[in-house]
Amino acid sequence: FNEYYSDSKKAIEIEETDGEQTLVIPNLRPDAAMQFLSRRAYSGSNKSSLYRFFETREKYYFCTSEYLTDKYSGFEGISNEERNRLFFNYRVLDDNTGTGQLKAQQSINDVRYGKKADSFAEMKGGAYRRNVTELDILNRTRISRQYDYTSEYKDYKAPEDLKLTHSQEFIDSYMPSALAPSTTLITDFPQIGQNKGDLDKPYQHFYENYTTKPAVDYHMNLNAFTIEINGRIALYPGMVINLDLYKFSNTVAGTRETDTQRSGKYLVMNIDHRFTGDEYKQSVLITKGGLS
């Protein structure tokens, strides 16, 4: 970062990584090189290790979503004015009163849900379970391990406690470990607790990065959706907002009942700004990795 972003006046906020790695970076653009490092980075405290490199108006970030959730999801001690800035209410009819227009600045204009779960793709891609065999060419050892998202996901920090998209019974019946995708990794480093040997090379976390990152990333993207708001609110990727959504069936009927599964804290993933004449809209991609 210091070499290729030396002309930038923006600071970078970095979440510390764990472990030592020796990497040869291919001939990549600076941003692609940072993404390359994010794919190899490992965190012992934030179990997903799903590092991202991204830029906002204020600075650059190199961190996990768990780091952002820990640092920016607390609303305790924040004034009502600041707190309300992060709350959004779905509205059907415009309220043209003075108070109504103030509320409109924090109201959702549209909700666009993303793709539905594809169970066949999840079976094939190992969205819940994966089998990994590590072949240690130096020590001539073979280690087989099974990754199970259903037993690990509660250890991954999200804006709120999550539920699995499928029931445990469905996953056990149609995505058993015995039928999970299998991959073989060639390693040249000792396992945890083994002697480093003559190369003095520490454990490289191949297994953790190969299994955990794709699974967590899949569920975060699967459960992401887009909200549209008037462009008057200071939002940026990495912010945690508190979202109020109502059940659409009740809203159309003229009543409002909170959708408890989809309301709550969300992590802002991306923002698109659109200007049409004198209208300024923001399309905000948000996720919390699952339902509450």
Regions found by a protein language model. Name each.
Residues 1, 60-62, 227, 243:
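Generic low-polarity alpha-helical segments
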Residues 1-11:
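Glycine-rich, acidic and aromatic/proline-enriched surface loops and short helix-turn segments
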Residues 12-112, 116-120, 127:
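Short beta-strand-centered interaction patches in the first periplasmic/extracellular domains
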Residues 80, 84-292:
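An acidic/polar, Gly/Ser/Thr-rich interaction patch typically located in mid-to-C-terminal regions
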